[in-house]
Every structure is written in C-alpha cells, then in structure tokens.
Amino acid sequence: MENTIVVKLGGVASDNLTEDFFQQIIQWQAANKKIVLVHGGGHYITKMMKSLAIPVETKNGLRVTNKATLEVTKMVLIGQVQPAITTAFQKRNISVIGLNAGDTGLLEADFLNDANLGFVGKITKVKTDLIEQLLSENIITVIAPLGINSEYDWLNVNADTAACEVASALQAEALYLLTDVPGVKKGSEIIGEIATDEIEKLQYAGVIKGGMIPKLASAAFAAENGVGKVIITDSLNTSGTKIKNKVAIG
C-alpha cells in the first residue's frame, strides 16, 4: 500500500513514545503517509507474571506460553499496553484505534512447530481490509501481536514477526523496528546496511546474537517480501541499520 509506514514499538513501549516520536508521526501524516503501529509488551508481561508468581520461561528468544501465561499476555497487551499507547495519541489529538485478533479475525495464525513453546504462533494471514479502511480515513491503527487459529485458539506471536507480516501484507513503503539499541552493532560501530544474504554469515561470526537474531530474521522476511525499506533503530529520527534485499552493492 503506497505511502504506508509500519512501526514496531519496543517491548518497553513507553520508551518509544517521546515528543520526537510524535513529531515524526505528525510530519508523516502531513505528507499523507498512512501509519500502522504494532506493539510488543514483553517487559510488562514479565512484570505482571512475576507479581502473580507465574514462572517466566523463554526458549530461543520466545516466551514459553502455557494457558496461564497466555491469559496474562492477552490481559497486558490488550488491557494495559495498547490503551496506554492509544491514550498517548489521543492526548495529542491524533486519531487512533487499537486492534487485535478478536477484531474480525485480523491476524490469522497457527501453532509454531515446537510443542515445547505452548500457545505460541506464527501469522498465516493478515486481513488487511479493516486496516486499509481505517488508514483511508487517516486513522492510525495500533495492533497487538496476538493471533487466532482455525480452532479459535489465541496464540502469542513475536511482535517483530507480527510487524513484518503486517508490513508485508500491506506492501508498506517502510518498516521501522524500534528496539533499545540504535542499530545492529559490530563492535562499537553501527552497521549502516546489511543485505539479507549476509545475515547468516554475521550470525556465525558472532556479530549478530541474542534477541537480534530473530529480529533480523523477521526484518529479512519483510525486505524479501515487498516492503520498500526496513530499518532497525531506537528512534524514528536516527538512521539505524537498513536491511536490504539480497546482495549489498560494494
């Protein structure tokens, strides 16, 4: 969708909602850009689980999600994080609406092929009609990373993956994956650009590690599936690391 920008907010969403962030959103809207936000909430989910004495377990960067964890995840994402984000926009008189998989089956999903993860899923389809209708009315959409499968099970979805699937389905002009670092680092230097076919090599070299591994895998998917520009950064106002499809020039 021409002129559409997707932004994935970090796990501590409030860290991203700075005045500079909102000024960039306002500038984009003035330039007739359509904005979609996908938010995480890992920090808040972990905090709530600990307060309820529910064990926190992760595997390969993904939260192991049993029934209790799933209920907490839904409660926090839909009932705490998303309203905080939409309220921040409303305070600035920016039209916004929060969406989740319960809204017309927005994000269809299926279980990941790992029974040890529990109710963790992957997006199989993004129903773009509702998103596009709202964007046509200049309403920013804020989407929670939860999916529903054919049996109507709710599934926890990695927020980076969800953002990349949404951006790809919309054929977005740009995707910004906001995180807590200003880009992908090699030593102390930010790498300006990474081609998708360089990612595995950088991973083996130890340049890419930890939570950056699944983030780059998601970014590569978006770059290879029609998203015009994919950037990993800590702010909409910094250049970060651009993920480019195929082989980098030079």
From Swiss-Prot:
Substrate binds at G41, G42, R63, N156. Its main location: cytoplasm. One of its GO terms (cellular component) is cytoplasm. The record marks K8, K215 as: Transition state stabilizer. One of its GO terms (biological process) is arginine biosynthetic process via ornithine. Keywords: Amino-acid biosynthesis, Arginine biosynthesis, ATP-binding, Cytoplasm, Kinase, Nucleotide-binding, Transferase. It is found in: Cytoplasm. Pathway: Amino-acid biosynthesis; L-arginine biosynthesis; N(2)-acetyl-L-ornithine from L-glutamate: step 2/4. It is an enzyme of class 2 (transferase). One of its GO terms (molecular function) is acetylglutamate kinase activity. Its EC number is 2.7.2.8. InterPro entries: AceGlu_kinase-like_sf, AcgluKinase_fam, ArgB, Asp/Glu/Uridylate_kinase. Pfam families: AA_kinase. It comes from the Bacteria. It catalyses: N-acetyl-L-glutamate + ATP = N-acetyl-L-glutamyl 5-phosphate + ADP. CDD domains: AAK_NAGK-like (cd04238). Catalyzes the ATP-dependent phosphorylation of N-acetyl-L-glutamate. HAMAP family: ArgB. Belongs to the acetylglutamate kinase family. ArgB subfamily. This is Acetylglutamate kinase. It comes from Listeria monocytogenes serotype 4b (strain CLIP80459). The gene is argB.
